C-alpha cells in the first residue's frame, strides 16, 4: 500500500472513530441520563415534538433535546428530556417542524457586508430583467439626489428568464439622474451616465487600476463598462469611491446583517477578509458589536493584505499583534488569507482565459508561507485553477518539509473548481482542507462555453474530495460573487443545478440533502478549529440550531432555496423567531440606516419571507 493510501485510510479511520465516539456519548446520555455532564438544576431550554436531523451518523434523528449553559445536554425522545423541565425552563413545542444544527458558511465576506448593509439593492432572488429594472425604478423614487443606487453581486444573468443582463440603455432610461453601479461577480461593472459623470471616468485612463480596464468608445468617452482583466481591483476601487455609512450606522448595519443571516438559519461564518478589509482597522466595528455582547453569529476572521509587495511586512506586523485561536466562541482570530500574496492570486472569471500566476510567485510567496508556518499561523489560500494549485503546492510541500512534514493545523484552500485527482492527493497528504462554494453555479454557461460540459461535471470534484478524506466545508463566497443565502448553495450541492437551471453534475458529484447540510455544519466547523465543538445537535456541543419553515428533507428540489428559519438559536439563546414562535423572539433591532435604504422597499430575505 502506498503512502498516500495509508494517509487517507488513517484520516478516514480518525474521522469515523471521532464520530463514533460522539455518537456513543449521545447514546449514553439519552439512555442513562446525566452520565457525562453534571446538570445542576433544570435545563435552560427544551425543544420537543421536533423532527431533528442531528448530523450525528450513529443517531441521525431525534424528537427532542435539552440545553444548559449554552451547550446541548441531552438529545433523544420527548420522554428522555421531560425530567429536565423545571419551573424556569423555556419549552418550545416545535410542532413537528424540521430542526437542524445552525448553518456555518466556511467562506464568506460577511464582516465587510455588515459595514455596507442597508445601502445595497439586492437581486439575489430576482428571476427576470423586467423585475430587476422595476426594483431599480422603485429606488429612483425614494433615493435622495446625490446618493448612489448600487447592486453589489449575489446574482447571475443566468437566473433571469431573459438569459441576459440589463443593458446600459435600459439602466440609463430608468435612472437618468441618480448614479447607478451594477457590480457583476468580479467580471465587470456597469455604470450609468450619471455615475460616469460623478466618477469622472471620461477623463480617467483606460488602465486606471492594475489588470483592469475602463472601456472607452472611439471618442475616448467611458461607455459605462469597467472590466476585470483579470483583477477585480477596478471594481472594488470604484466601490470605495461611493458614499459610506457613519460608524454608528455600520454597527447597526452589522447587527441587521447578522439578523438576516439568522433568518436563513446561519449561526456561524468563517470570514475570508477581502478588498478594503485592512487589519485591524476594518474590524473595529465587528469587535465593538462582539464586545458589547450584541453578536448573533459566530465569526472567525482572517487577515488579508491589501497591497502587493507589502504582504511579508503586513504579516510580520500582524503576527506580533495576535495569535491564531485568540478570542472566544463568538469571535476569534484564525489565520491568514484568503489572499496571502497577490502574486499567488488567480481570480475566478470563467468567461475569460485562465490567468497565470505571477512569474515571481515562488520568490515572493515562499518567505510569507514560511513566516506563517514558523509562527503556527494556519492560512487559507484562494485557488481556482489546477494549474495554480500545482505551483502553490510545490511551495507548501517545501514549507511542510521544514516543519516536520506538516503545515499549521487548519491550513486550507478555498474554491478548487478545476482540481485534478493528483492535486487532491497532494492536498490530502498535507492534511489540508478545501472550502467549496457555489460560485460555479453563477457562471455555468460561461464555463461550458470555454471548457465544455464534461469539464463542468467535476467542477469542483466534491465527492472525490470527500472520498479521499479531505475536510470539506460548505460556503457561498458572498456577498460580491454569490448570494449569502446558504440554501442556494445547499440546493446546488444536493441537485447539481446552476442558478439558471442547468444540470451540471451527474450522481457521481451530487450529495444527498443530509450530506449537503453536513458540509454546512460539521464540515465547516473544521475550518475554524471547532471540529467536535459545534456542527451537530449532540451532547457537549455548542447549542446552535434552527427550526425550519419547511421539511427540507422532503420538499421538491425546486423548493430547497425557499427554506429559511422560523426560529434560530446561538448557544441556546434565541436570536430570531416569528409566526408560531413569535413569543420567543428577541426585541426588534432599531430601524436600519439610512432611512431611505432599499431594505424598506425591495428588501432582503427577511422582508421576502417575513414581510
Give the ranges of each region predicted by the language model.
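Flexible glycine/proline-rich, aromatic-decorated loop/lid segments
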Residues: 108, 432-465, 486-498
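Histidine/acidic-residue-rich catalytic or RNA/ligand-binding cores of hydrolases
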Residues: 193, 279-283, 388-397, 444-450, ...
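Active-site microenvironment of metallo-dependent hydrolases
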Residues: 1-85, 127-144, 191, 251-263, ...
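Non-cysteine beta-strand/loop elements that form the S-adenosyl-L-methionine
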Residues: 330-341, 432-440
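Acidic (Asp/Glu)-rich catalytic clusters
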Residues: 321-328, 427-429
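Short acidic/histidine-rich active-site segments
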Residues: 377-387, 465-489
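Glycine-enriched alpha-helix->loop->beta-strand junction motifs that scaffold or abut catalytic
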Residues: 428-435, 469-471
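Divalent metal-binding segments
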Residues: 42-48, 53, 57-319, 334-388, ...
Amino acid at each position: 500500500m502506498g503512502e498516500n493510501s495509508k494517509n487517507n485510510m488513517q484520516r478516514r479511520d480518525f474521522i469515523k472513530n471521532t464520530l463514533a465516539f460522539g455518537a456513543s456519548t449521545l447514546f449514553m446520555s439519552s439512555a442513562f441520563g446525566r452520565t457525562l455532564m453534571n446538570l445542576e438544576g433544570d435545563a435552560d431550554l427544551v425543544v420537543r415534538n421536533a423532527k431533528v436531523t442531528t448530523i450525528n451518523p450513529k443517531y441521525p434523528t431525534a424528537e427532542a433535546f435539552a440545553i444548559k449553559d449554552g451547550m446541548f445536554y441531552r438529545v433523544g425522545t420527548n420522554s428522555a428530556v421531560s425530567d429536565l423541565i423545571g419551573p424556569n425552563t423555556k419549552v418550545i413545542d416545535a410542532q413537528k417542524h424540521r430542526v437542524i444544527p445552525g448553518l456555518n458558511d466556511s467562506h464568506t465576506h460577511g464582516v465587510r457586508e455588515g459595514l455596507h448593509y442597508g445601502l445595497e439593492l439586492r437581486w439575489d432572488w430576482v428571476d427576470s430583467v423586467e423585475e430587476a429594472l422595476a426594483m431599480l425604478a422603485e429606488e429612483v423614487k425614494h433615493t435622495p439626489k446625490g446618493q448612489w443606487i448600487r447592486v453589489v453581486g449575489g446574482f447571475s444573468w443566468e437566473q433571469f428568464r431573459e438569459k441576459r443582463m440589463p443593458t446600459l440603455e435600459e439602466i440609463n432610461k430608468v435612472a437618468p439622474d441618480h448614479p447607478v453601479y451594477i457590480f457583476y461577480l468580479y467580471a465587470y461593472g456597469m455604470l450609468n451616465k450619471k455615475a460616469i459623470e460623478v466618477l469622472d471616468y471620461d477623463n480617467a485612463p483606460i488602465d486606471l487600476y492594475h489588470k483592469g480596464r475602463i472601456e472607452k468608445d472611439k471618442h475616448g468617452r467611458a461607455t459605462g463598462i469597467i472590466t476585470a482583466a483579470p483583477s477585480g481591483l477596478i471594481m472594488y476601487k470604484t466601490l470605495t469611491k461611493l458614499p459610506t455609512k457613519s460608524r454608528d450606522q455600520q454597527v447597526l448595519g452589522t447587527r441587521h446583517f447578522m439578523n438576516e443571516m439568522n433568518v436563513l438559519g446561519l449561526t456561524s461564518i468563517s470570514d475570508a477578509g477581502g478588498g478594503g478589509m485592512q487589519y485591524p482597522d476594518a474590524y473595529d466595528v465587528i469587535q465593538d458589536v462582539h464586545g458589547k455582547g450584541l453578536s448573533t453569529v459566530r465569526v472567525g476572521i482572517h487577515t488579508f493584505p491589501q497591497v502587493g509587495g507589502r504582504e511579508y511586512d503586513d504579516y510580520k506586523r500582524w503576527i506580533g499583534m495576535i495569535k491564531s485561536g485568540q478570542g472566544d466562541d463568538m469571535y476569534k482570530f484564525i489565520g491568514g488569507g484568503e489572499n496571502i500574496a497577490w502574486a499567488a492570486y488567480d481570480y475566478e472569471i470563467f468567461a475569460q482565459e485562465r490567468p497565470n500566476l505571477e512569474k515571481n510567485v515562488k520568490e515572493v510567496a515562499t518567505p510569507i508561507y514560511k513566516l506563517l508556518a514558523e509562527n503556527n499561523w494556519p492560512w487559507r489560500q484562494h485557488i481556482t485553477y489546477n494549474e495554480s494549485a500545482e505551483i502553490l503546492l510545490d511551495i507548501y510541500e517545501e514549507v511542510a518539509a521544514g516543519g516536520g512534514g506538516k503545515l499549521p493545523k487548519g491550513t486550507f484552500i478555498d474554491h478548487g473548481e478545476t482540481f485534478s485527482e493528483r492535486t487532491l492527493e497532494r492536498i490530502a497528504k498535507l492534511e489540508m482542507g478545501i472550502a467549496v462554494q457555489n460560485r460555479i453555479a453563477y457562471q455555468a454557461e460561461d464555463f461550458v462555453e470555454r471548457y465544455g460540459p464534461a469539464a463542468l461535471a467535476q467542477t469542483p470534484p466534491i465527492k472525490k474530495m470527500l472520498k479521499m478524506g479531505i475536510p470539506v466545508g460548505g460556503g457561498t463566497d458572498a456577498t460580491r460573487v454569490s448570494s449569502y443565502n446558504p440554501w442556494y448553495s445547499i440546493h446546488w450541492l444536493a441537485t447539481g443545478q446552476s442558478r439558471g437551471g442547468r444540470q451540471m453534475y451527474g450522481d457521481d458529484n451530487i450529495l444527498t440533502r443530509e450530506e449537503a447540510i453536513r458540509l454546512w455544519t460539521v464540515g465547516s466547523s473544521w475550518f475554524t478549529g471547532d471540529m467536535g465543538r459545534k456542527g451537530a445537535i449532540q451532547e457537549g456541543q455548542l447549542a446552535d440550531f434552527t427550526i425550519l419553515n419547511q421539511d427540507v428533507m422532503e420538499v421538491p428540489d425546486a423548493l430547497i432555496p425557499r427554506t429559511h428559519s422560523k426560529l434560530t438559536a446561538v448557544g441556546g439563546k434565541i436570536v430570531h423567531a416569528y409566526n408560531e414562535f413569535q413569543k420567543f423572539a428577541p426585541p426588534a433591532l432599531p430601524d436600519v440606516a439610512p432611512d431611505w435604504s432599499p431594505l424598506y422597499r425591495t428588501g432582503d430575505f427577511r422582508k421576502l419571507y417575513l414581510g
